[in-house]
Amino acid sequence: MRTVLTAAATAALIAAMASPAVANSKDEAGTPSSNAAGAATSALKVNERNGSFDLQSHRGGRGEWTEESLAAFENSLALGVTTLELDTHLTEDGKVIVWHDDTIQAAKCADTAPATAGDPEFPYVGDRVAELSLAQIKTLNCGFVQLPGYPEQDVIEGNRIAELKDVYQLVRDTKAAKVRFNVETKVESSQIGGAGMDSLTRAVVAEIQASGMAERTTLQSFDWSSLNLTKEIAPELPLVALSSGDAWMGVGQPGASRNLGGIDIDDYDGSLPKAAAAQGYDVVSPTFRSVTPAMIAEAHELGLPVIPWTVNTIADMERLMDLGVDGIITDYPTRLRTLMAERGLKLPKAYEVKG
């Protein structure tokens, strides 16, 4: 079992995760404030105690560019974000791709041609990712239409679904030495705690370790059994406990929860921070609507940063920052970066990307 972090250690972890850029443009981004450890208490907001704040670009900034596209991640690097947040699935032939949905949806992707002549599985739209090979998935045009509900989204024409290793290579090519990765194992609901979870988790961990950037990567999941397996096979990786709220965790419901790796949340007073700390996780990432001052105070007391998802309006960003969250996952990284600048927070380094 991991040792629970002290408040000082929490501040250091948050500063390392946020990797803020210093005001002097000649300096490299990411030097934590020297007063972080000495000033850290659960009563202090992270943006007051060390100036760091984790700006996470959700799916590469879904509100601004075609989600999970390499172009979106590249644009996020050019903008200047702390963390690239992304989802992973496993193809039929064992390749880790960066995509959110279990099935290929017509609202996002269109068939172009079969991967091989006469492929009996063609067309592929509507099929499960787990039942398609990488070659089949690569034929899909997943950049042809603006996603409904995101009127500011720029369509990345002809986008092809990327592999996880491609995102790491992009960051390597860009020499984005301070940007971090928050990688989600997107376990299908039917596979929670099962064989599908196991194979996906092992494949994702292997890709992270092969990237040479494991020290800049956190692994997150709504299937806490995936976190537990990661803790066993890669104890060096920080783990992020995702939560969709009390009902999802099973608060007040009898018995153990499949979502939570077989624990009963009521054994931890219905508390996300208490449950996550007891399991040895490093960060809590609740839905933003469930965040309360009490949750933040409890999490910080237990040594856990709080990074809610998915926060898209300025009003919600301001409210959560005032409460003292340690970062925000957003579809609109430009909005959050602008707000951080207005508040005098140190901004993540913006990188020059190849045109």
PLM feature spans:
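Phosphate-group recognition and catalysis centered on beta-loop-alpha active-site segments
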Residues: 2-9, 15-355
